[in-house]
Design a protein with these regions (language model features):
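Active-site core of bacterial EAL-family cyclic-dinucleotide phosphodiesterase domains
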Residues: 166-208
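Conserved long alpha-helical elements within nucleotide-processing catalytic cores of c-di-GMP signaling
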Residues: 2-30, 37-63, 73-77, 81-82, ...
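A conserved signal-transducing helical linker
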Residues: 2-8, 12, 49-52, 164-171, ...
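Catalytic/regulatory signature loops of cyclic-dinucleotide turnover enzymes
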Residues: 136-161, 165, 175-187
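Catalytic strand-loop-helix junctions within cyclic-nucleotide turnover domains
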Residues: 83-94, 110-115, 119-137, 162-166, ...
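A short linear hydrophobic-aromatic micro-motif
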Residues: 68-71, 188-190
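A structural signal for short, well-ordered beta-strand segments
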Residues: 31, 80, 120-124, 190, ...
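Catalytic core regions of nucleotide second-messenger enzymes
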Residues: 72-76, 104-121, 149
């Protein structure tokens, strides 16, 4: 399906809609980045038609039929972005609301597909600064989502510089390594491993 889910906007339409809402101060906006764990195994065990159905069900449940949703967008096969209105809601209210939706949806998936454990990952960014570019705001929601990967005990994560620092540092190191490879600045040294019992070199460890 490639993210072309019935009822969802394209990338530019989504960004423009969110920008318009934020600039006019029409609603308080919270951005969502969402995907699910182990989606590949639904395709493998139950077939691609079932996988497509799960993706459309996510689109319907979290965005298209959600009364708080102002705009939504599908990316790739299993990535979603959305904007909810959070008028008269605290941050804690929004987190609780999303957590309840996750429990409902995960329970339904576990009943339909008992062979595959499913967890919904959600990152949130409260878009309270209209001067911030919408693409950067969406990236912050996505960064919050990525920071919870593998943490099945976290129903959703709100972006903050503190809780995303570790991921940012990892991303910076990865980018620096890629640049170093491209510029041929990588040197590899072999550190020998000595076998005391056999009194010989048993191997080596590569140091970059």
């Amino acid at each position: 399906m490639g993210g072309c889910y019935l009822g969802m906007a394209g990338h530019d339409v989504f960004n423009n809609k969110v920008r318009e809402i934020v600039n006019t101060n029409e609603h308080r906006v919270v951005l969502l980045a969402l995907d699910i764990s182990n989606f590949k195994y639904i395709n493998d065990f139950y077939g691609m038609d079932e996988g497509d159905k799960v993706m459309q069900d996510i689109a319907d449940f979290y965005f298209i039929n959600e009364p708080l949703c102002l705009a939504s967008h599908g990316i790739g096969f299993d990535q979603f972005r959305g904007a909810y209105k959070a008028d008269n809601m605290t941050n804690e209210d929004v987190v609780g609301y999303i957590a309840r939706k996750n429990r409902i949806f995960e329970k339904e998936l576990s009943e339909r597909y008992p062979l595959v454990y499913q967890h919904v990952y959600v990152g949130l960014y409260f878009y309270d600064d209209p001067s911030l570019d919408v693409r950067m705001a969406v990236d912050r929601a996505n960064l919050a989502k990525k920071s919870t990967k593998g943490r099945f005990d976290i129903p959703c994560c709100v972006y903050s510089a503190d809780n995303c620092n570790e991921y940012l540092e990892h991303m910076d190191m990865s980018n620096e390594f890629v640049r170093a490879c491209e510029e041929e600045r990588i040197e590899i040294f072999l550190q020998p491993k000595i076998s005391v019992s056999h009194n010989c070199v048993a191997g080596a460890e590569a140091l970059v």
